[in-house]
Curated annotation (Swiss-Prot):
Disulfide bonds: C49-C62, C56-C67, C61-C77
Main localization (coarse): secreted
Domain of life: Eukaryota
Name under which the protein is recorded: Conotoxin Vi6.3
Propeptide: 23-47
Function text: Ion channel inhibitor that inhibits the increase in intracellular calcium upon depolarization in DRG neurons. In vivo, both intraperitoneal and intracranial injections into mice induce hyperactivity.
Keywords, alphabetical: Disulfide bond, Hydroxylation, Ion channel impairing toxin, Knottin, Secreted, Signal, Toxin
Length: 79
């Protein structure tokens, strides 16, 4: 009787964990290498322009941003 209860609880627990995992991974890509490639493509160091709040002393600002607050250390890209 105790063994049956333990088995039923174990099956319910494993089923619940499978359902939770399925919901979590639904919107993620299947292959990790593809995700890593996308992350490397969008890496901050791979861009040729500075994003909002980044310094614009050594690189130009991205389209739609302007270099503001010029001082000794250079400005920052802002809207």
């Amino acid at each position: 009787m105790k063994l049956t209860c333990v088995l039923i609880i174990t099956v319910l627990f494993l089923t619940a964990s499978q359902l939770i995992t399925a919901d979590y991974s639904r919107d993620q890509r299947q292959y990790r290498a593809v995700r890593l490639g996308d992350e490397m493509r969008n890496f901050k160091g791979a861009r040729d322009c500075g994003g909002q709040g980044e310094g614009c002393y050594t690189q130009p600002c991205c389209p739609g941003l302007r270099c503001r607050g010029g001082g000794t250390g250079g400005g920052a890209c802002q809207l």
